[in-house]
């Protein structure tokens, strides 16, 4: 689940969890009413894998105070509403086992990537990613590789090994 530290993401989580549970119940009913037994239907046991938190711009290596309040609410709201687990110990996003990644605000790389029609981690100097952007592109590549690796691990998908 992609999230930003804002009210819209919190409200989205509050809506998503109950809707997923309703969808599973409705799907179970549909499975029993399958008119064609030879038609193999998925079990419908979709489970959330976690959430990805997008940081807003940092100030002195920490989020702006207004965003910190929203960020602090995410782990509990995710656990309570999406996973339907009762509140337990209060976790920070940094220590939450359900957090897949905490992606930084890559500032000017996003518009460069959009203009170049390519992912941020494939930007080259010819795309305008020169100077300090070169290190930022490397950081984006590392961050997305870590995210892909974690997603694959949690979902049991084998990643291709580099040659």
List each language-model region with its residue ranges.
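Conserved Switch II/interswitch segment of TRAFAC-class P-loop GTPases
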Residues: 1-30, 59-67
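C-terminal lobe/tail of nucleotide-utilizing enzymes
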Residues: 31-163
